[in-house]
């Protein structure tokens, strides 16, 4: 478990450097065409730099716009205009730790509420405060154990 936690911490630090990019809006015509036209570069020049035809360069711009361009093709286009493709993922929760905590709390809530429902049927209902405390405790246990059910 300790090795896992260390890996998560290290990866989280790397991913955190991408957090500011979440706000970045992809140009509606795609990055390649936006950069190419901003630089005053023609499709012929882009294609020539990439070692492909004008039509192939144009097709790549279209594929990027519709989301079907490969990373390899985008890297090639980037190299041809002296740029580097940067690729990564950003947790929607802000960090890996927050993602894990949210998933663990969902599972903990299901477990505790199922148990609480059974106890209610037996006239042994817990208070809201006790239920919240049980959810917090179970969440901490799940985070420590990191079971595979987090990702079901």
Task: Please describe what each predicted stretch is.
Residues 1-27, 95-152:
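N-terminal flexible/basic segments that precede or flank functional cores
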Residues 3, 30-49:
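Short basic helix-loop element that most often maps to the first helix and adjoining turn
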Residues 19-20, 30, 60-64:
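Short, contiguous strand/loop micro-motifs
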Residues 50-69:
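Recognition helix of helix-turn-helix/homeodomain-like DNA-binding domains
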Residues 71-87:
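DNA major-groove recognition helix of helix-turn-helix/homeodomain DNA-binding modules
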Residues 82-98:
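Short C-terminal boundary/hinge segments that cap the last helix of small helical domains
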